C-alpha cells in the first residue's frame, strides 16, 4: 500500500528504507545485462564480489555470487566483459545500497566465445591431446615443406622468403585456402589431408597473420584440431602474433610465434650449418694433429732408449746366455748319465754276489724235501726221506740215510 506523509508528520528514514527493501524483495529473480568493471576474488572466501555497470547510463550495481558460478564462466569473466546475470535484488537499509545476489552468469559477445573455447580446451586437454609426450620431432632437413595459408598473404610471403633465405634449395608445397569465414575450416581440412598423403612432405606449416578473436576461430575448430592430431606428418602452428593463441597452438607438434618464426623452425640456416661443418673440420684437424704429435713423441721416446740404439746387442747377449746354458745342461746331463751308469754296474755286481745261483757256482748245493722246503739242518729229515739236490748244473734226486 502507498505510504502517506505530511510536512507535519514526515516518515523516518528507516521507514522508507524498510519499505524500499520490502518492495525490492518482492521482485524475485531477474535477468540483468551489464558490463563487468571490478572483480574481487578474496582467498579463502566462497563468495566473489563484482560491480556491474550499465553499458549506456552511468549507473552501477554491486553484485555477489558464489565462486563456483564465476569459475564456470571461465576466463571470459574479466573487466570489461559484457554479461547477462540472473539474480535476486536486495536493498540494505543500513547502508542504503542496492545489491544483486547472482546464481548464473552468461557471457555475451567475445566473452561467450572465450567460454566456449575454454570448455573445448578443457575437453581436449583431458583427452591428452596437449600432452608433450605425443608431440613429434621435426625433421632436420625436410624433403618438402607443406604450407597452408591464405592466398597472396603476408604469412605466405614471410614463410617462403625466410625459408628460401635460410635454405635456397627448400621445396615448398603450397596450398592456398580461406583463413577466415565459413569456408575456412573445410578448405584447411582438405589441404591438410592432401599434404599429409604426400610422402615427400615431411612437415606441414599452417600459417596466417594476426586478427580478432572471431577471425581466428577456424584455427580453434574441433574438427581441425582432431585432424592435426591424427595426421602422419608433424604440424607447425604459425597463427597470428605472439599474443594470439588459438587452440591449434596446443595440439600442433610445434608452436611458432609468427610465420617468420615457423620458417626458422622447419629448415636449417645454410650459413649456420656451413659454419658448423667448418668448425667441426677445424676441431677434427686439431684433434688429429694433437694425436699425431703425441704418437711422434712416443715413438721418439722409444727410439731414444739404449736398447733400440743397438738392438742386436741384446740379441747377441741373449744368444751367449742361451749357449752357456746349453753347454751347462749338456755337462750336467753327461755327468748324471755317468753316475747312473756306475751305480748300475755296482748294483749288478752286488746282485750277482748275493744271488743263490752265484753261491751254487762256487760248489754249494741246495737240498729240498718232497714239499720243496729247503733243508737247513739234518734234524729236519729222516732216513729214507726223498730229497732233491740243486747244484749249479741242475737238480738230481737223493734219499736220506
Swiss-Prot record:
Its EC number is 3.1.11.6. GO terms for molecular function: exodeoxyribonuclease VII activity; nucleic acid binding. Its main location: cytoplasm. It holds the Pfam family tRNA_anti_2. InterPro entries: Exonuc_VII_L (IPR003753), Exonuc_VII_lsu_C (IPR020579), OB-fold_nuc-bd_dom (IPR025824). CDD domains: ExoVII_LU_OBF (cd04489). It is an enzyme of class 3 (hydrolase). Keywords: Cytoplasm, Exonuclease, Hydrolase, Nuclease. It is found in: Cytoplasm. The keyword Cytoplasm applies. It catalyses: Exonucleolytic cleavage in either 5'- to 3'- or 3'- to 5'-direction to yield nucleoside 5'-phosphates. One of its GO terms (biological process) is DNA catabolic process. The keyword Endoplasmic reticulum does not apply. One of its GO terms (cellular component) is cytoplasm. Bidirectionally degrades single-stranded DNA into large acid-insoluble oligonucleotides, which are then degraded further into small acid-soluble oligonucleotides. Belongs to the XseA family. Heterooligomer composed of large and small subunits. This is Exodeoxyribonuclease 7 large subunit. The lineage of its organism: Bacteria, Bacillati, Actinomycetota, Actinomycetes, Frankiales.
